[in-house]
A protein has these predicted regions:
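A short core secondary-structure module
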Residues: 162-197
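Glycine-rich phosphate/cofactor-binding loops in nucleotide/flavin-utilizing enzymes
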Residues: 358-412
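Glycine-rich beta->alpha junctions and the first turn(s) of the following alpha-helix
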Residues: 203-299
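Glycine-rich phosphate/pyrophosphate-binding beta-alpha loops
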Residues: 161-166, 243-247, 381-384
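Glycine-rich flavin
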Residues: 48-56, 61-164
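Basic/polar N-terminal segments that are highly enriched at the extreme N-terminus
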Residues: 1-24, 412
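Generic structural signal for well-ordered, non-transmembrane alpha-helical segments
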Residues: 27, 253-256, 260, 292-299, ...
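C-terminal helix-coil-helix/basic helical segment that borders enzyme active sites and/or dimer interfaces
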Residues: 38-41, 300-343, 357-362
């Protein structure tokens, strides 16, 4: 790992890929991942090799501004990379969610001393992940993990869940309760003694995101590794909307993957329908119609995601102006845009994944093809956030001007 004592940063971009190079490298990595995606998912084989390539390609530097030594990619660029990777395997972009949430804060915040250390790690290709959620608590968001003083240092003890991407990462952030009873965060190297990353994620979909548990047993924490998290801050609210769009983009990748699988299946094996006069499946009007509908759905989903990304780009631009009124207006529009996108994109995405089976008969259900992974992955992604609540919040806003949940900086 990079030197933890490193205290300086540089705006010299040497060794950091450009925005265009990252997009090209993402396509190369996706091509490699796609070759074995169905088998990997069927056997639940975590893609450590793919994440090694992602680190080598420095995909995780994309949102770091040029002034801070990065390629200066936009949110639209980053979302595009997610959909490129997701078309090959939607698990891959999903597992990068915590990392890009972390780098968004680096991109938009003033760089303090400790941030300089983290920035150097990001620019070196290191990945960040972690977990806040715990199982077995009375309400979501409750924390039982404890950070206790131990002389001039601290000890961290607890068990986390939904540690998405942590198995592939180099550094992790974890929430805890301090000796004073107040919430506190830590950001520590994941190879530190006492950290055990568990391979116990048992979801029906997104099975290779490494979203299971992490045991924290008497883990040493240094004073400079303490962090604070402000969900209600402006950057925190922006990041919340971006995290939700990240999930939608991962699912959009699965939709594009379903379209690709459908085309390949028709051209290579599918037969005509029983009542068709066509001799081959690619000439069958029933198959053509269904594939056209699948293509339209996939196009609509990608278009929705891209438009929401452009909305969040405008929020990032507003931050650069320092205009409080402009920032607040952009944050509100970003929350609305990502919520609207998820409501409709979820419906279209699941329809596409279901209609994939209409392209063939019983052979389309072959477990070897593993077409059902697309539906399972999409359904799992959209189970992360309460879609019905989003629709209600939007309706309340239009009818009554209520913005409470739109401004709280949480997944609403």
């Amino acid at each position: 790992m990079s030197n933890p004592k490193l205290q300086t940063t540089t705006t010299d971009n040497a060794g950091v890929p450009s925005r265009d190079e990252i997009l090209a490298r993402a396509k190369d990595i996706a091509a490699i991942a796609a070759k074995d995606a169905a088998r990997r998912e069927r056997q639940r084989e975590l893609p450590f090799d793919i994440f090694a390539l992602i680190k080598e390609a420095k995909i995780g530097t994309l949102r770091v501004p040029e002034a801070k030594g990065g390629p200066g990619g936009s949110i639209s660029d980053y979302i595009e990379v997610l959909m490129i990777l997701g078309e090959a395997d939607s698990n891959i972009p999903h597992a990068l969610r915590s990392h890009f949430n972390f780098t968004e804060n680096l991109a938009l915040s003033p760089i303090e001393l400790e941030d300089r250390r983290h920035l150097e790690h990001v620019l070196a290709g290191k990945l960040f992940a972690g977990a806040s959620t715990e199982q077995g608590t009375k309400r979501p968001g409750e924390i039982t993990t404890r950070l206790s003083a131990d002389g001039e240092r601290y000890r961290l003890n607890g068990r986390k869940w939904y540690a998405t991407g942590t198995a592939f990462a180099d550094f992790g952030t974890f929430s805890a309760i301090g000796d004073d009873g107040q919430p506190i965060g830590v950001l520590i190297p994941l190879d530190r003694a006492g950290i055990t990353i568990l391979d116990d994620w048992d979801s029906m979909g997104q099975r290779m995101t490494a979203s299971g548990g992490v045991l924290l047993e008497n883990v040493e924490v240094l004073p400079h590794e303490l962090t604070t998290r402000k969900l209600g801050s402006q950057i925190g609210r922006h990041s919340s909307a971006m995290r939700q769009l990240h999930l939608a983009a991962s699912a959009a990748g699965a939709v594009q993957g379903a379209l690709k699988d459908g085309v390949d299946y028709v051209l290579r094996q599918a037969r005509t329908t029983l009542h068709s006069s066509a001799e081959t499946a690619n000439q069958d009007p029933f198959v053509q119609k269904m594939l056209g509908e699948i293509s339209a759905g996939a196009f609509a989903v990608k278009t929705l995601i891209r438009e929401a990304a452009r909305t969040l780009d405008r929020t990032a631009v507003a931050f650069a102006t320092g205009d409080e009124e402009a920032i607040e207006a952009a944050l509100l529009e970003g929350s609305l845009a990502t919520a609207r996108t998820q409501i409709i994109a979820s419906q279209l995405s699941l329809t596409v994944a279901t209609n994939l089976y209409e392209l063939g008969g019983g052979s389309a259900t072959s477990s070897d093809r593993n077409f059902d992974r697309h539906w399972r992955n999409i359904r799992t992604v959209y189970n992360h956030n309460p879609l019905a609540h989003k629709a209600r919040v939007i309706g309340d806003y239009y009818l009554n001007g209520t913005t409470t949940h739109l401004r709280e900086g949480r997944v609403f």
